[in-house]
Regions:
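N-terminal glycine/serine-rich phosphate-binding loop of ATP-dependent small-molecule kinases
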Residues: 1-79, 128, 135-158, 171-192, ...
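C-terminal, non-catalytic interaction/recognition modules in large multi-subunit enzymes and RNPs
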Residues: 9, 140-148, 271, 283, ...
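Long, intrinsically disordered low-complexity tandem-repeat segments
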Residues: 591-664, 703-704, 708-709, 716-717, ...
Length: 810
């Protein structure tokens, strides 16, 4: 059997999904290792593979935040910018549009340009907008620029000459000379030959800025995977949702900046609903995207590194990237987002995140600031009986907010929950209401480790009556990678090209060569489109291509009216020609577990990298019984009274009938997995093993053969050295935490505070609707069903939340 592996590296967690043609699936979740991202990948892949032969892996598809983080943290390589004489200041001068956050800031200063003014160089040449050579390239000026660049110790250069999209000959000649002394040189005609000088320049600069990092990273990734026996091709997802080879991704690194969020949108598009709003909330950020007719919305320009980033919707706030990307709105709101009080004493949440180290206070890894995860634990939405969390630490953190606000702990916690839900709703607002889309006709597809806990509250703000939580929602982005097809985009600007067919043919041949296919191969699909504008206007709109000028004009008029709300007619002109070439891959694995699955054989083998020196001797918190969760959130007796015992009390406020998480063990040995009670994987803002021992790179695994899920945490020291493993084996479905429903106290304002609510898994709720308030503990997340909502389990094992008509109209 051949296997495909999807790997999604996020700001807090690294998710791995292994799919096979028979429908078997294994999932792993581990803390992202920011000091060495590949360490977390290897740990997760090792756990997901288990006893399977790594040589049977046929494909690894990867989505990474490496490029995004390099831009946001300004950790790329130093870049030299080479341009036409007289235009050196175009990029340093830049553009910036003030946003709400800094509109009245008297000390405001725009972000620094992507390249320093002293690192910009000019060469003598000139080409017209139609491609005619007005001044030949002076090669001596190129050599002088190369010498100056080398003298400064710069090893990466971006070449963007005026109107090179119309005639790239000078760029190619200049690059040839520069490569004699500079290792990494990219040209705008190679990266994205589209009209608009500033955007084309910044796109080229960003590719040179992150390209060497991406090339080194992907090379090391292939080497490290080969060390564990995986020699399959490594593919990387582009921002537009296509998948390309690692070699091509290294050359076109700028096209991978939004690869991680794109994978999640593909997963949302595959839920079976034609019109959905993708809602992905992880540990650091939340993303929203509109999918209409099963196809995600695409933008041809987005901004990265800006303040208050909303993807392509906050033009001017960051560095413009002129490549296709799934049109996302993103906010700094995740499970690890820190709650704080501003100078006026108002409660704020985010955008700063506790990340994976130290993480939320309840992790017990040294964090003390209150986060969204801590608030959800205090509210009873998370269980420390099945997850290795410390309620006392969460309570202490929330007290830091409650005391100055003059409210009770649970009121402060719910305020955090509401504020972060409102923040995430702003992302949904950007991609729907702000563009004239009524969200009430859409289903909200929630995934990511923290998304299902907040999805219903976000939906309520827009009158959305259906929320869909797909199977394996906590690793949906990694699962979406398995469905990605080989695909790439190309563009060329030609003002009213005399032979559009020849332009499309050239672009198609170029894209096919990059993917290693022929345009005539079976299953290869080429989608053509063109940018059209009214003559005399500078902004254009993209419409699908047709050779008929009249039909093309009609499509443009209709699109213009849809976007701007104005019916206008006039003479049009064609600006840029676009193609997307998609090549077939092996059929995607069926990652949906059947409703009734057999119990897998217990895996009692420690992971290959386990060592005895860093053994986790902590018994699992839920090892005593799989059927009772007597968790009581802190101060759960009333919505206003604080009855939480002090941190050093004998019994913690989230007491269970099991041994305490820090109970001593007779010997540092790994427990027998077959004797441990099953428990769900953590949501995307909580660690897997017990907090005192959980470090970066420790993985948590779930397997299904087919459909059954086994979750297995391991431990690792913060330096990445792995320790002995503990494991929990679930009996069926998505990691059922118990054979029968349980109950615990959770806070809902509709119930006037804390109330006993049922706690189910996808298996225990099968066959009957589950009215709220209720909690569904999933394999990698937790689904909160508020009052007025009803949960049902679909045949695809997706959980559907529907809101009562009375609630929607009230």
């Amino acid at each position: 059997m051949g296997y495909t592996i999807g790997v999604d590296v996020g700001g807090t967690f690294t998710d791995v999904v292994l799919g096979g043609t028979s429908g078997a699936i294994a999932v792993a979740k581990c803390l992202s290792t920011h000091y060495d991202p590949i360490a977390g990948i290897v740990a997760g892949v090792t756990w997901a593979l288990g006893d399977r032969d790594p040589a049977q892996v046929t494909r690894v598809v990867h989505a990474t935040t490496l490029a995004t983080n390099a831009v946001l943290e300004r950790k790329g390589v130093r870049v030299a910018f080479v341009t036409t004489q007289g235009f050196r200041a175009a990029v340093p001068l830049g553009r910036y549009a003030r946003v709400e956050e800094d509109r009245y800031d008297l000390r405001f200063s725009p972000p620094p340009p992507p390249v320093a003014a002293g690192d910009c160089f000019e060469v003598v040449e000139r080409v017209s907008a139609r491609g005619a050579v007005l001044t030949p390239l002076d090669l001596d000026s190129v050599r002088r620029a190369a010498a100056a660049i080398t003298a400064r110790g710069i090893t990466s250069a971006a070449v963007c000459l005026l109107h090179a999209y119309a005639n790239p000959v000078h760029e190619r000649q200049a690059a040839e000379v520069l490569r004699e002394s500079i290792p990494d040189v990219v040209t705008s005609s190679e990266i994205w030959p589209e009209i608009r000088e500033y955007e084309r320049a910044t796109t080229t600069i960003m590719s040179a800025y992150i390209g060497p990092l991406m090339a080194s990273y992907l090379s090391q990734l292939r080497e490290r995977l080969a060390e564990i026996g995986i020699r399959a091709p490594v593919h990387v997802m582009e921002s537009s949702g296509g998948v390309i080879s690692a070699e091509l991704a290294a050359r076109r690194a700028v096209a991978t900046i939004e690869s991680g969020p794109a994978a999640g949108v593909l997963a949302a598009a595959g839920t079976g609903f034609p019109d959905v709003i993708s809602f992905d909330m992880g540990g650091t950020t939340a993303k929203a995207c509109v999918v209409r007719g099963g196809t995600p919305e695409i933008t041809n320009e987005f901004h990265v590194g800006g303040k208050g980033s909303f993807g392509g919707r906050r033009a001017g706030t960051g560095v413009p990237i002129k490549t296709p990307a799934i049109d996302l709105a993103e906010v700094g709101a995740g499970g690890g987002s820190v709650a704080w009080l501003d100078a006026a004493g108002a409660l704020r949440v985010g955008p700063h995140s506790a990340g994976s180290s130290p993480g939320p206070a309840c992790y017990g890894l040294g964090g003390s600031e209150p986060t969204v995860t801590d608030a959800n634990l205090v509210l009873g939405y998370l269980s420390s009986a099945s997850l290795p969390l410390t309620p006392d630490l969460a309570a202490k953190a929330l007290d830091r907010l409650a005391s100055p606000l003059g409210v009770s702990r649970e009121e402060a916690a719910y305020a955090v929950h509401e504020i972060v839900s409102a923040s995430m709703a702003s992302a949904v607002h950007v991609v729907t209401v702000q563009r004239g889309i009524d969200p009430r006709g859409f289903a909200l597809v929630a995934f990511g480790g923290a998304g299902p806990m907040h999805a219903a509250r976000v939906a309520e703000r827009f009158g959305i009556g259906t929320v869909v939580v797909p199977a394996h929602c906590g690793v949906a982005s990694a699962a979406g990678l398995l469905t990605g097809a080989l695909s790439t985009d190309r563009v060329l600007s030609r003002l009213d090209a005399p032979d559009p067919s020849a332009v499309f043919t050239s672009l198609t041949a170029e894209a096919a060569a990059d993917l290693g296919v022929s345009p005539s191969d079976p299953g290869v699909v080429v989608t053509r489109s063109v940018d059209v504008r009214f003559k005399g206007q500078s902004h254009d709109l993209t419409v699908s291509w047709t050779p008929s000028r009249e039909v093309l004009a009609a499509r443009f008029f209709a699109r213009y009216e849809e976007v701007y709300g104005i019916a206008q007619r006039g003479e049009i002109e064609l600006v840029s020609y676009r193609i997307r070439l998609t090549a077939p891959t092996a059929p995607p694995p069926d990652t949906t577990p059947p409703p009734h699955a057999a119990t897998p054989t217990a895996d009692t083998t420690p992971p290959p990298h386990a060592t005895a020196t860093t053994a986790d001797t902590t018994p699992p918190p839920d090892a005593a019984t799989p059927t009772a969760d007597t968790t009581t959130p802190p101060d759960a007796t009333t919505p206003t009274a604080d009855t939480t015992p002090p941190p050093d009390a004998t019994t913690p406020p989230d007491a269970t009938t099991t041994a305490p998480p820090d109970a001593p063990s007779a010997a540092p040995v790994a427990p027998d997995r077959s004797t441990l009670a099953p428990a769900p994987c953590p949501e995307d803002s909580t660690p897997s093993p017990s907090p005192p021992h959980f470090g970066a790179g420790a993985a948590r695994r779930g397997t299904a053969e087919p459909g059954a899920t086994r979750t297995a945490p391991s431990t690792a020291t913060p330096s990445g050295a792995a320790g002995d493993a503990t494991a929990r084996d679930a009996t069926a479905g998505d990691g059922a935490a118990a054979a029968v429903p349980r109950a615990r106290r959770a806070y809902f304002p509709e119930t006037n505070g804390y109330a006993d609510v049922p706690v189910h898994t996808r298996d225990t709720m099968a066959g009957a609707p589950l009215p709220g308030p209720a909690v569904i503990e999933d394999a990698e997340s937790t689904i909160v069903v508020p009052p007025g909502w009803t949960a049902t389990l679909a045949e695809t094992r997706a959980v559907h939340l529907t809101r009562s008509t009375t609630c929607q109209t009230s």
